[in-house]
Amino acid sequence: RSSDLMFENCFPNTLETTVHYRTTDGKPDTFVYTGDIHAMWLRDSGAQVWPYIQLANKDPELKKMLEGVIRRQFKCINIDPYANAFNDGAVGGDWMSDLTDMKPELHERKWEIDSLCYPLRLAYQYWKETGDASIFDNEWIQAIANILTTFKEQQRKEGVGPYKFQRKTERALDTLNNNGLGAPVNPVGLIVSAFRPSDDATTLQFLVPSNFFAVSSLKKAAEILNVVNKNTSLAKQCTDLAQEVETALKEYATYNHPKYGTIYAFEVDGFGNHLLMDDANVPSLLAM
């Protein structure tokens, strides 16, 4: 049947065209191209290999490939938790002139909450499917510490934090206003996302679907830290932050629509402004 043929052609496409596997220091290491761009987005790489997790126990080579993606993602986070896309090595790239703290290992440095959530989702599901906890080593612990620090900085309770981004461009959605800080927010417990999963700049910086993704991802991280690492203090930090963001979402992320009643806004700023829309890529309101 044509549908079977379509599946046979499409399902292995990521393996055939974007996955680059090697071992580094004796451990699996997988660099995943995002489409035709020779760079690895944390979000896209996590989504591209996601369908293969269910088959990991049936194919040892596939399992090693997945382990390599997860290990590579942890390394990337520890290079720079604010970056969304990375090079295969310190080779520089097209966006080195962006006005932000660029490094040669980075392809792009757009701060997007979901970039730190997709690796947690992938690692958690891999662990649940395979029972392999070897990935949760010191690199993992450091990645979690960096994720927590970054999320807390971008709650902006103690100033605007270290992240700024500007690009010389004719496209407004590829840069941030307000001297690279983006629109002001009221620090109510939500996390700022300077850019959306589409890589477009947010209008109001509390991106609601991505804050929900942060809540679920932090809870998954806490479970791993408790069960595997026995690191209850770090797990509690994850749980506490998840609860704080979840509470803030209930209070600030909804809008009383005159026709549809209570709905979630796509973006808010904590001052009472709401952006009612949705955007391509996941997480989105529709995808929730």
Annotate each predicted stretch with a short phrase.
Residues 10-17, 44, 51, 115-122, ...:
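Amphipathic, well-ordered alpha-helical segments in soluble domains
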Residues 10, 51, 68, 72, ...:
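Generic, well-ordered alpha-helical scaffold segments in large soluble proteins
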Residues 15-28, 91-99, 184-196:
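Active-site-adjacent bridging/hinge elements
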Residues 55-60, 126-142, 201-205, 220-240:
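Inter-helical turn/loop segments and adjacent helix faces that build the functional surface
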